[in-house]
């Protein structure tokens, strides 16, 4: 198809910035960016612009002047969070004791998905048993859920801000023989 693609994967903002700087030095034509964090991208985007490299954001927004990138193809993270909370409310549970597994703090996805749950906790009586970052990581999510299980704290909902963290949560539930799903001991 005439295109050559290079790829760098990291969930850490500093590593992403380093990779982006290398792509700029390599003289790529386009830089597609799904940033782990919303901050810290101004100098990279200016360098890309100065080098004539078009930047396209996808999956997540960043805190930068819109003139520094060509396009942004992103989800409405706040709406995603509200949709998840609305679904939880539709389950009509007698109580909501929630383990909240957050993504990378400060990312657009984390902020949007957390905001809706925080509002529900403040206005609808949702009890946040714990609210911790698992940084989009299944293993960290499993450790957090296992810690709550081991503590004996009562919970019946796990609100995970991405699929990998939900998988980690389910692994902890399975290990403890706790049923999960709609109509089970824990809704994930």
Q: Across the structure, where does each feature detected by a protein language model lie?
A:
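A residue-level marker of the well-folded mature domains of exported/periplasmic proteins
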Residues: 1-188
């Amino acid at each position: 198809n005439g295109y050559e693609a290079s790829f760098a994967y990291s969930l850490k903002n500093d590593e992403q910035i380093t990779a982006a700087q290398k792509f700029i030095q390599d003289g790529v034509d386009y830089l597609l960016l799904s940033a782990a964090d919303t901050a810290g991208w101004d100098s990279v985007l200016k360098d890309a612009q100065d080098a004539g490299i078009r930047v396209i954001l996808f999956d997540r927004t960043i805190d930068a002047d819109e003139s520094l990138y060509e396009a942004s193809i992103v989800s409405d993270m706040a709406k995603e969070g509200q949709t998840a909370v609305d679904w939880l409310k539709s389950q009509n549970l007698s109580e909501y004791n929630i383990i909240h597994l957050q993504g990378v703090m400060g990312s657009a996805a984390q902020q949007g998905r957390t905001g809706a749950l925080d509002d529900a906790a403040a206005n609808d009586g949702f009890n946040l048993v714990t609210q911790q970052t698992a940084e989009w990581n299944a293993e960290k999510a499993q450790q957090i859920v296992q810690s709550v299980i081991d503590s004996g704290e009562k919970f019946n909902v796990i609100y995970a801000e991405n699929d990998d963290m939900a998988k980690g949560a389910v692994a902890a539930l399975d290990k403890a023989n706790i049923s999960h799903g709609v109509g089970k001991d824990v809704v994930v």
